[in-house]
Amino acid sequence: VPDIAASDPQISSDQKTITVKIKKGIKFSPPVNREVTTKDIKYAMERTFSANVPNPYATGYFGTIQGAPKTPAKGIPSISGIQTPDDQTLVLKLTQPKGATVAAALVMPLTMPVPPEYAKKFDAKNPSTYNQNVVFTGPYMVQNNAAGSLTGWKPAKSIELIRNPNWDKSTDYRPAYLDKIHIDEGNSDATVASRRILNGSALVQGDGAPPAPVLKQAATRFKNQLQLVPAGGTRYVAMNTKIKPFDNADVRRAVFAIFDRNAMRLTRGGSIVGDIAWRYIPPGIPGFDEAGGLNPPSSLDFASNPAGDPAVAKKYMLKAKAAGVPVTADGKYAGTEKLLMVGTNADPGKKSAEVAANQFEKLGFKLSFRIVTQDALYTKFCGVPKAQVAICPNVGFFKDFVDPESFINPTFNGEAIQPANNNNWPQLDDPAINKAIDAAAILAPGPERYKAFAKIDDDITALAPAVPWLWDKTPLIESKDVQGVADNYSTVWSLSFTSLK
C-alpha cells in the first residue's frame, strides 16, 4: 500500500527510469512544520551514500542510480540520477536495467523524507547525529523539544511516542487509535518481560522474542494472546571468511556438518517457530522452490543431517588439513588461538548463541565468547568489519521486499561490505558470486530471474559462509486487553493499527 507515494512507481520499458508521484498535504513534525516534497526524499537517499551516514542498502540496492558513489562519500553527494522535476515528482535514472529491483526497494527506510535545511548540521558530523534529532511524517513522533532534540528517547531505557500534531488523517490509511505509546528498552531478561506482557495490561512485545518456555506456555494457556507471523527470513550463524581458519571453505563445511540445527531451533521454541533451514532464500520468496524447497540435495552432504553429522564434519576437517589448516588426525581443529564470538545477552538469542558455541567446541575450536546487547551486537561488533569478530551466532536476514535479491545481494555480495552497518556478516567476497549477483539483478521479475538467484543461493550454500538453521515464523505476544495487528512486512506489531479493547 503506498504511504507517502500517491501510487505505485512507474517503470520505463527499458527498466532504466522510475517515476514516483507523492501525496500533497503530508507535513513534518515539529520543529520543521512544513509540507514534504520530493526534494526531501532526494536528500534522504543522497545522505545514505555519505561516510557520515553509512548504509549498506544504498550501494546494494541503489548503486545503479546515475551518479551514485561506489564508496561512501565525504559529505552529502549530489546524485544526478535522483531528479525532482516538481515538488510531487521523483524520477530515478539508472545505469542498468534494474528498475524492478530499485522500485521494490523504495519501501525501505532510507527513502523516508529528511528535510535538508534541518538535517544538514547533524549530517555534517561523523557519525551523523540526525537519529537523535529526527523528525517524522506519520501519526506518531518521539517526544522532542523546540530545537528537535529527542527528549523522549532515553538510550537503552525508553522511548516516548506522542501524536504528531501535523499529521493529517485524510492523507493516511493508518487509523492510529492510540494517543501515546511508551516503549521500554534494555529488557535483558526476556522471560520476565514476556510474562509481564502475558499477565499484564496494555502491553505488546517489541523486537525481542519470547523465550522457548514462555512461548510454549503462550501456545497453551494464552492462545488468544499469541500470533505467529511468517517472517520471510532466515536465521544463521555467520563465520568471518576473512579470519583464519574460516577463510578455508572445508573448515566452514565441517562446521555446517557438525551443527545440531534442531537444538538451535529448540532454543526458540521448536517446530512452532519454523522449519529447519539449510540455505538462505526462505519459504514464500521466489527462488525457494527453484533451489530445492525444504530438502537439501545429496551433493551437499554437510547440510543433510539437521542433528549434525560428526563423520561428515571429520571428512571436511581432514580436507582442510591437506590444505595446511592445523587439524588433528581425528578431525579436530589444532589451532591455539581464541576466536572471538559475539552473541546477544537476551534469551532466546543468548541460548541460541550458547548452543552455537558448543557446536564449534565439538570440533576443537577455542572461543572468546562475549555477550552484548542486541543493539551493540550489530553496531559495535558483527556489523563492523574492523571489530574482527570471527563468529556471529545471532544474525539472520528478513525480507526487504518480496524478491530473492534482497536475501542474497546485501548479505553475500562482496561489493556490499561496509565499514559500519554491514550486513555481509561472513564478509564473503567471491568474484564469481559477485558477478552472478550483478547479472541476476538486472533480470526482470519472472522465472529466469528466480532460477538465477536460486542457482546463486546453491553456490553460496556450497561455500558454507554461514550455517542457516531456521526459516522463521515470528511469535508475537500481547496483553489480554490489547487488539494487536501484526505488520506482515516487518513482522512486529503495527502500533499504528493496534488498539486497546
Language-model features, listed with the residues they occupy:
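N-terminal lobe/hinge region of extracytoplasmic solute-binding protein
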Residues: V1-S13, V135-T137, M141
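Surface-exposed binding/hinge segments that line
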Residues: S13, T17-K21, V36-K121
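Gly/Pro-rich hinge or "lid" segments in bacterial periplasmic/extracellular proteins
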Residues: I76-P77, P97-A100, A105-A176, K180
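Ligand-site clamp/hinge motif
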Residues: S128-V134, E160-Q217, K366
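Append "and occasionally in soluble cytosolic enzymes with long acidic Gly/Pro-rich linkers
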Residues: S149, K157, I162-R163, D247-N358, ...
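Ligand/substrate-recognition segments at binding pockets and active sites
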Residues: K154-K157, R174, N199, A320-F397, ...
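A bilobed periplasmic-binding-protein/Venus flytrap-type ligand-binding module shared by bacterial periplasmic
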Residues: I162-N166, V229-A254, I258, T267-R268, ...
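Detector for C-terminal structural segments
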Residues: I258-G293, N345-N358, K380-K501
